[in-house]
Amino acid sequence: MLDVVAYRDNQKADITQEAPLTILVYAFLIGVIAGLRALMAPTIVAWGAGLGWFSLAGTSFSFMSSPITRYILSFLAFGELVNDKLPKTPSRTVPPQFITRVVTGAFSVAVLGAARNALLGGLVAGAIGAVVGTLGGASVRGALAKMAGKDMPIALLEDVVAILGALFIVSRV
């Protein structure tokens, strides 16, 4: 079984004492972010690790805190933000994009270490959050774009929500 260790203030945290509901809520919300922008969740998680918000030392995910990982993910996330605005970009609900969002949501939750010995619950919550974020995000964006008469301002607003939401969630874990 994968053992993910979390650190807070350079001391090993006993994350088994954290309320399971809180862990599942964070996992779900990270999934929602991945549903909005597939690469935003892992990118912000990598930056959180790199900035020392939590430590991945001694885990299978320690590579996520390296500068090269952060820069590559940032470059790819920026590309996703640009590509999302192009008229020929397929809907996020087509199978390849949908599956990617579920996988990146679950992966991001795994990196954060949803809970020791409760990783499966966190992964499931993250995957469900990604489904909700994908379908809900597409629905809300479509409705708001229809009301506004333009998609671009709503797409940019969605970018801001994804970036700030990910920063908020990851900084709290």
Per-region residue spans from a language model:
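Helix-coil boundary and interhelical linker segments in multi-pass alpha-helical membrane proteins
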Residues: 14-25, 48-68, 108-123, 168-173
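Core segments of transmembrane alpha-helices
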Residues: 80, 100-109, 158-163
